[in-house]
Amino acid sequence: MFNKIFCAILSLSLCSGMLTGCTKSNKTGSIQSNPAQVEPVQIEEPQIPYSNHISANKEKLDAAVDQINKDYGVMGSSIAVWEHDTIVYSHSYGTASLRKTQYINEITGEVTTADTTPANCGTKYRVASISKMVTAMLAMQLQEQGRLSLETDIAALVNEKLQNPYYPNDKATIEMMMTHTSGIIDGAGYTSAINKQPFPALDVVLQRNNFSGLKPGSSYSYSNFGMGLVAGAIENVTGEPFCDYAKNALFEPLGIDASFVTDYIKDRNSIATFGSEDPLSWGNMKEIYGQIPVGQMYLLGHGNLFISAEDLARIGIILSGDGIYQGKCYLKKETLDNIHSPRVYDYKTNVTRGLAVQITSDIIEGVTLYGHQGNAYGAISCIFYDPSTQRGVVFLTNGASAKRAESQIYAVNDAIVKQIWQYL
């Protein structure tokens, strides 16, 4: 009788999972099938096997990561570690901002001014190329909805001048943009454009050469321009400015204070500076980028995400698990498998790449990690996770050494992930 009830419950659970499109999988254990040892059914919270280990050693771990920060000249940083759907460790170090900030005592009304702001769990960092991973998530949501195909020709969707002049009969697809194999590179037109304000229209950028001369899909060449154009593709199929679509489709549903433009950050004083470089001095970013017509975006999506370590960890929970966070499905499991499927090998950094995701087995012996690194304005950052255990690490900085480890991962990222993983 018990077995019939158990099977009925299991069948109902499986059907419910298939109807939602996102399914929760048990990756931490196996079902024991000896009926003689079956106990009455009890619903328990998922076990977190290592969080107590981290809690018991938090002071030791804090001291170890602080020393790594010192060794690599980190200005300010924040770390968030998760398992399954829970953030189990967070820690911040150093200075987040050199911006003068006024503080008002809520009780006395006294106003004080501070020349620096220490980093904390709410500090928002510009995460540079980690942004590409989030842009790809947004594109893959649209792919699930049938609104965007990975096989779509970027020239047909965004701008006909993106047709490769060396291979006029070969299309450069959205998938090629995500794998850096499109033949569209950070050429003279692009590098000139990003150093100007107001930013020129895409037509102007394309007046100068931005093609590698290699057949689309045949060769790897890291391209910020290509991932920026994915933002333009998203605008074309949604009819919304990229920063608005990201806010409506991902950040607000997640309940996180993040954006590709600083204007949308609720607590703008929480945005980290890069030494003396202050993102708040860049002006009204929404207005500046808004001068580029909707559907012609070629910036933002490649590297302009501002987010805290804990909020990026929440996105990591989606990517490392079953696409679900707090009961809401953001990506289907088969989509995550597609994202994580190896496409190309980057010999310069010794990293295999999926869809806007880096894949490496050279940080932790015997563990394949997925994620991305960021490097801009002197800030080095990373997110790496293991889908097989649903564990991951976010490490964000506003300034650090760009030295590389033997693995070719940035040395500070390599050291932090190794240190954290000892407790996982």
What do the PLM-derived regions correspond to, one by one?
Residues 149-166, 253-254:
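Short, glycine/proline-biased beta-turn/loop segments that scaffold the active-site neighborhood
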Residues 18-33:
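Sec-dependent signal peptide cleavage junction
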Residues 54-125:
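Short, conserved catalytic-motif segment at the N-terminal edge
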Residues 97, 104-108, 166-376:
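Short, surface-exposed loop or secondary-structure junction motifs
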Residues 62-65, 85, 126-154, 230-235, ...:
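Active-site SXXK
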Residues 380-384, 389-400:
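Short, well-ordered beta-strand elements
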